[in-house]
């Protein structure tokens, strides 16, 4: 039987030396949102708790000022 190799999770923000996550940085935020609009949990992304809290706050701020959608576009 073949064994599956799991890729080691790491925090991208720690590796890059990011101090604060900006709510205006949409390219970064979109990487942590599912196609339905949910915030991806840190156990899947590998993000540290400190940055996960900042990420959640930044996503919620971006949603509030209508930069990011709350949900997907509901087209059938």
From Swiss-Prot:
Magnesium as UniProt keyword: no
Coiled-coil intervals: none
InterPro entries recorded: Ribosomal_bS18, Ribosomal_bS18_CS, Ribosomal_bS18_sf
Family according to the record: Belongs to the bacterial ribosomal protein bS18 family.
Classification of source organism: Bacteria, Pseudomonadati, Pseudomonadota, Gammaproteobacteria, Oceanospirillales
Membrane-spanning intervals of the chain: none
Subunit relationships: Part of the 30S ribosomal subunit. Forms a tight heterodimer with protein bS6.
GO biological process, alphabetically ordered: translation
Job of this protein: Binds as a heterodimer with protein bS6 to the central domain of the 16S rRNA, where it helps stabilize the platform of the 30S subunit.
HAMAP family (alphabetical): Ribosomal_bS18
GO cellular component terms given for this protein: cytosolic small ribosomal subunit
Protein known as: Small ribosomal subunit protein bS18
Gene Ontology MF, one: small ribosomal subunit rRNA binding
The organism of origin for this protein: Marinomonas sp. (strain MWYL1)
Keywords for this protein: Ribonucleoprotein, Ribosomal protein, RNA-binding, rRNA-binding
């Amino acid at each position: 039987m073949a064994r599956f190799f799991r890729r080691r999770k790491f925090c991208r923000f720690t590796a890059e030396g990011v101090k604060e996550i900006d709510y205006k940085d949409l390219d970064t935020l979109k990487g942590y949102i599912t196609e339905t609009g949910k915030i991806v949990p840190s156990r899947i992304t590998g993000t540290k708790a400190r940055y996960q809290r900042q990420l959640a706050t930044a996503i919620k701020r971006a949603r509030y000022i209508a930069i990011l959608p709350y949900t997907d576009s509901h087209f059938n």
